Amino acid sequence: VCSSDLAEKYGEPLNILEPFIAVGNSGKLVMFMPCVFLILISDFPIMGGNTLFFIKRTGKLNWFLGQILSIIMSIFTYIAVIFTSCLIMGKGVWSNHWSNSITKYEAAFPQESGNFVSQLLPSNLYNQIPIVTAAIQTIILLSMYFFLLSLILCMLKMLYLRTAGLFTVFLVIGCGVMTCSIKAPAMWIFPMANSIIWLHYKEILREPITPVANSFVYFAVII
């Protein structure tokens, strides 16, 4: 909605992908999205009195793979809902480049430089990579971030440590928020920084602070 207001004020439509990229790379929203997702799946996997019977009938490996598949489908559905909502509310048009409403907004309204709306898509992002690449990387990195948190929650729940699992995942999110907010080098230890594309780049120079490929390796190794 904020990005639509930005486009309306500038007088040109957004690219249809820009609202989703803005949501997926917002430091504030990337804090809330995993929290909402974890609340939605907080009871997963359900460990009831019949669980041991199901595991015995299906086999431990098949049961565990079923839980992983459920996590993947939950993540796919959650991101699809966010993506579709952004497409509908964004009222954008399709093109293969960033819109002028994003790239030239601060030049047209310098008095608003640095406010929340103008920082939804920072120059670290649109000056560095094509918009389609940004959208694809946002989807993949967010999915891997959610999957890692879900896996931690699932593993501890299977050990009957549900409270410890919730505490652990929210601690990981909180540490990511704190380190990202001050851009401490330690932020790369936590998954949040690795899921936000613009943190990987400098504002003007086409030179990465940390290659995005490193974040893919980070998630692949941990998962």
Residue ranges with predicted function:
Residues V1-E8, V177-I182:
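Alpha-helical transmembrane segments of multi-pass membrane proteins
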Residues S4-I41, L65-C154, M158, M192-F219:
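Secretory targeting signals
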Residues L40-K56, K60:
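Transmembrane helix boundary and interhelical loop/hinge segments in multi-pass membrane proteins
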Residues K60, R162-T163:
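Membrane-helix interface/capping residues of multi-pass secondary transporters
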Residues T163-V177:
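Central hydrophobic cores of alpha-helical transmembrane segments
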Residues C175-K202:
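Extended hydrophobic/aromatic segments used for targeting, binding, or gating
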